[in-house]
């Protein structure tokens, strides 16, 4: 670790020493013990935001407060940035809303550590002393590639629903096993996901779908481990999906850029069309699901409707009049589902492209002015349509 401490960070630690020790904590420490040095550095100490502002006033270090209540701020110098958190205790309301209702600042690593989630994330590195502080034997669990709650799992997972999703994501990205009692607690506390915002669910699910390339040690099938954990823990209903488990017939085969489309298609197929394609997409991506913007929901609906219309063997002309612009994505899904149908639609698509056959108004070699010249008495809307 010592060899990866920059001169600017070392100097910052020396400034802190006037009032307290400065530690690196969390993902950077965990990953460094795995030989990975490609994550942001999180810092922690007993100093409050106001004390840090006073300490660094007049130096080259810049300070930007993130949350006074939580005691978090960003310290930067040039291109280097560090997130700092004051040692604290947290109290949560019932449910899993991911935000403490009460915060108390404390003075020791041991007290701060009790608010954290998993032992692997709970190793502190003292920058100046070049030594680790490990209150919950996290270094041993990191060596074992084991993800385990720091205390009784229920006390860790029942107060913050996002920790369940983070658990699945980290295990996927790092190739860690999850301790049995931690898995059981996640299952028992899964209802807390109902209190997590759609945006946070979206962030975690997308990270899981992309987990195969997160780190150099991430496995090529890492994302499938995460999705299978969703099945095991029965998490899908909390993403507004009409199923408890999903058959990943398509998701397991497509390239990363198409995985979200494939996942939704697999959810629809698993549900045996309990609701229409449009309804299911809207439910999954709407406010109670992944909270996508309306424009993106419409885009997903169009692609998924096109995919299922292709499976229903819609005639070529009708299909491409409706789905020509989205065919690249539909084709990627169809290729992994039915080689015969993919070949059929691809042949027609390439025929249209190679022969430059007009499908959309913008493909026509005339514009609104041409139309007006030959048909001057039409209503304005016809000219405007071609002008676009």
Features from the language model and the residues they span:
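Catalytic cores of the polymerase beta-like nucleotidyltransferase superfamily
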Residues: 1-388
